[in-house]
């Protein structure tokens, strides 16, 4: 039986996620220098609402969206009931902050973040994560992103990152393309401190195997709240140094074209596979906010093949496959030799 969450659980998570939205928006405006977020507050007919913030045509960001929502409903959709059958027939509450940034410069990666909390009758859980999608590969950027999120997870429990990293690789995977959306990061869902850490669907995958070896989770509500807090705070230090390094790098029209081509994969994932998009649409969420994750421009090209030995080819052959980014010395040497380390 799950322990009940604290009496102020909803207010506490709501405030955490509102603060996260504020801090991220402030950090992004500061580094962009030109663009400002416009805010739109909205209400949902079935209960709750949110505030959507979008920055367009900044000096760094072509489009950046940071959303907060706090919503309630009578019955969770079947996609969630299948994971949490105890929630069936109960009214539910969900709050979350989600973000997708689409920079203009192809050398700055697209990035996504989402942290959320659910309650439904006797059950509650936390979910979240952050992942990076580069268009041009630089191992040092990838390492910084992973290092900061690993550190955030390990503040709560030394074993979490061992599961969340492969879980992220598994989740952000385009099955119809047989490639990863980007270089991963962390991903977790249905965390309530009971059972094993891994709660995904692939029992034969690395995340499941690592989780099985670790055994039962002994985290409580406060630990999982701290996890969301730590990981949320890790975002700016994981990403802003990449912008600082790459923002002034000039790019060609060919590199911009490749960025737009790869953005097409982002669109495909979000519309075909992403559970957050599907949940939002199934629960009559605000469509403009749900589809804010899509880039303002993208392109498709039939039968595209990158030139062998090009940076574009290194992206598609190495940086869209799960790797041990932090520890693989062979990968490090390869990136050094091919000028894609830093």
UniProtKB/Swiss-Prot annotation:
The gene is hemF. One of its GO terms (cellular component) is cytoplasm. The active site is at 112 (proton donor). It comes from the Bacteria. This is Oxygen-dependent coproporphyrinogen-III oxidase. Residues 266-301 are annotated as: Important for dimerization. Its EC number is 1.3.3.3. Substrate binds at residues 98, 114-116.
């Amino acid at each position: 039986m799950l322990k009940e969450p604290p009496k102020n659980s909803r207010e506490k998570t709501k405030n955490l996620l509102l603060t996260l939205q504020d801090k991220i928006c402030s950090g992004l405006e500061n580094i962009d220098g030109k663009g400002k977020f416009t805010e739109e507050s909205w209400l949902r007919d079935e209960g709750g609402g949110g505030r959507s913030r979008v920055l367009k045509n900044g000096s760094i960001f072509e489009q950046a969206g940071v959303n907060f929502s706090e919503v309630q409903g009578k019955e969770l959709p079947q996609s969630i009931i299948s994971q949490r059958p105890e929630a069936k027939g109960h009214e539910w509450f969900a709050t979350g902050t989600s973000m997708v940034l689409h920079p203009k410069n192809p050398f700055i990666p697209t990035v996504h973040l989402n942290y959320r909390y659910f309650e439904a009758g006797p059950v509650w859980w936390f979910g979240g994560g952050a992942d990076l999608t580069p268009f041009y590969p630089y191992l040092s950027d990838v390492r910084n992103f992973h290092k900061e999120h690993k550190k955030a997870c390990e503040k709560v429990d030394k074993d979490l990152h061992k599961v969340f990293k492969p879980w992220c690789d598994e989740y952000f995977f385009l099955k119809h393309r047989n490639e990863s959306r980007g270089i991963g990061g962390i991903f977790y869902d249905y965390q309530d401190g009971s059972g094993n850490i891994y709660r995904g669907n692939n029992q034969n995958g690395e995340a499941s195997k690592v989780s099985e070896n670790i055994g039962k989770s002994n985290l409580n509500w406060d630990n999982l709240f701290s996890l969301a807090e730590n990981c949320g705070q890790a975002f700016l230090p994981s990403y802003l140094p990449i912008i600082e390094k790459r923002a002034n790098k000039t790019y060609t029209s060919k590199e911009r074209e490749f960025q737009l081509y790869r953005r097409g994969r982002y669109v495909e994932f979000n519309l075909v596979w992403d559970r957050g998009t599907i949940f939002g649409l199934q629960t009559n969420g605000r469509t403009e906010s749900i589809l804010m994750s899509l880039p303002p421009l993208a392109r498709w090209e039939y039968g595209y093949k990158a030139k062998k030995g090009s940076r574009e080819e290194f992206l598609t052959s190495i940086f869209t496959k799960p790797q041990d980014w932090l520890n693989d010395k062979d990968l490090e040497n390869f990136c050094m030799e091919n000028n894609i380390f830093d």
